[in-house]
Amino acid sequence: MPERTQAPVTLDIHQILSILPHRYPLVMVDRVTEITANKCIRGYKCVAYNEPWFQGHFPQRPIMPGVLILESLTQLGGILAYASDPFDATSNLMFFLGIDKAKFRHTVTPGDRLDLYAEVLHHRSNVWKLRGEASVDGTLCAEGEMLASIVDREP
């Protein structure tokens, strides 16, 4: 990955894939629209009907699983951590450690653009505590506080 002195304001899918270890079908952030290092990040996920989880959740009324909405927020938080304190994405991973205060308030369905927001609550060493919100058309769908840690890729 090329060296940089400042994180870009926006990231496309290719830049996201250079940071996140996730690949299809679990890349849950399509674009980052705003980054303020050590503070907050905004992005989105376009929710398509052909996502594999809609085959079983639920065929007659497809709804994005809440755990995947939280995964979207956690991935966005990982991108924020990288933009704030760059780590070697080829030898480190950001592991999700826990969630607090998770609430699911509205369904997310195929065709929705899931708008994502995360902010740093606390950061010390390799541990990050973040708060995230996911919304569709301005309606809050899910929120929670996530705890994550940067670890070596190889145990």
UniProtKB/Swiss-Prot annotation:
Pfam families: FabA. Keywords: Cytoplasm, Lipid A biosynthesis, Lipid biosynthesis, Lipid metabolism, Lyase. GO terms for cellular component: cytoplasm; membrane. InterPro entries: FabA_FabZ (IPR013114), FabZ (IPR010084), HotDog_dom_sf (IPR029069). This is 3-hydroxyacyl-[acyl-carrier-protein] dehydratase FabZ. The active site is at residue 57. It is an enzyme of class 4 (lyase). It catalyses: a (3R)-hydroxyacyl-[ACP] = a (2E)-enoyl-[ACP] + H2O. The gene is fabZ. Its EC number is 4.2.1.59. One of its GO terms (biological process) is lipid A biosynthetic process. The keyword Lipid metabolism applies. GO terms for molecular function: (3R)-hydroxyacyl-[acyl-carrier-protein] dehydratase activity. It is found in: Cytoplasm.
